[in-house]
């Protein structure tokens, strides 16, 4: 009897261990840039507006996240060419449309030109006034500048580790073309000097996207989870939490 009891206990423990493994949430790679307040990697439990929403959606859909942050052009390439890999925030545009599975928009973001002393009203005016414009390499902003006819000599694609706000403050570039909340957030951490913002010249949704080859069930679950987070007000609350205190102009 003792031997049977011992064997039974061993079997039960093995069964419980196997059950815990099989019931664990499957891990999915999530590629994000360090782009506060949209996505953050080094601020404790804070992951930024898009980061928090993406993680909440993944947890709700039954997935755990393995967060990765390679250089943004490489991140886009790896996700596009991979299988069942997630990426956020990603702007949906013509050049990217066929390369990804677009799960759902998380946030709408305005883009503008930022400078120390010149306000412009359009791409055309910016093209005539600014000699050198800093812009994130591999971003939708860089693509848009090229589509709007800016010369290569006017575009400064930022390298890894370069701080566009510092470059603008030191006069190394004339302007910075970027998302409004991100630019205000970074500038506020750097200086009290006024930052001159142009009229908003570009507005687009930021998506949670997946590899072109993506599990339809995962897409459906994540899409439903984001829809729920939008309807119950979670997305608005998270955005308000991160943008509180940022200058309006």
Name the predicted role of every residue range.
Residues 64, 140-159, 227-249:
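Ligand-binding clefts/hinges and TM-proximal coupling segments of bilobed small-molecule sensing domains
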Residues 32-34, 108-112, 188-225, 246-249:
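Periplasmic-binding protein-like
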Residues 25-94, 98, 157-158, 232, ...:
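Extracytoplasmic small-molecule ligand-binding "clamshell" domains
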Residues 33-36, 43-56, 117-152, 156, ...:
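Bilobed "Venus flytrap"/periplasmic-binding protein-like clamshell domains
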Residues 55, 66-128, 138-141, 197-201:
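Acidic, polar ligand-binding/catalytic clefts
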Residues 73-85, 101, 161-181, 189-190:
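Short helices/loops that flank or line small-molecule/ion binding pockets
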Residues 19-22:
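N-terminal signal peptide c-region/cleavage motif recognized by signal peptidases
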């Amino acid at each position: 009897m003792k031997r049977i009891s011992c064997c039974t206990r061993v079997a039960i423990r093995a069964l419980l261990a196997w059950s815990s493994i099989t019931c664990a949430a499957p891990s999915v790679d999530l590629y994000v840039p360090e782009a506060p307040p949209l996505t953050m990697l080094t601020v404790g439990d804070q992951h930024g507006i898009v980061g928090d929403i993406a993680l909440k959606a993944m947890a709700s859909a039954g997935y755990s996240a393995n967060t990765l942050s390679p250089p943004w052009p490489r991140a886009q390439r790896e996700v596009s060419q991979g299988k069942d890999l997630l990426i956020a925030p990603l702007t949906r545009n013509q050049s990217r449309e066929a390369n990804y599975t677009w799960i759902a928009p998380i946030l709408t973001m305005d883009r503008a030109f930022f400078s120390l002393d010149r306000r412009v009203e359009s791409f055309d005016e910016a093209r005539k006034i600014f000699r050198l414009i800093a812009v994130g390499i591999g971003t939708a902003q860089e693509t848009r500048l090229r589509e709007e006819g800016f010369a290569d000599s006017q575009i400064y694609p930022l390298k890894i580790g370069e701080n566009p706000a510092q470059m603008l403050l030191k006069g190394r570039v004339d302007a910075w073309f970027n998302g409004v909340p991100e630019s205000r957030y970074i500038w506020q951490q750097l200086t009290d000097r006024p930052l001159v913002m142009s009229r908003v010249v570009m507005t687009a949704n930021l998506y949670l996207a997946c590899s072109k080859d993506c599990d339809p069930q995962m897409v459906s679950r994540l899409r439903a989870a984001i829809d729920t987070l939008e309807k119950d007000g979670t997305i608005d609350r998270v955005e308000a939490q991160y943008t509180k205190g940022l200058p309006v102009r």
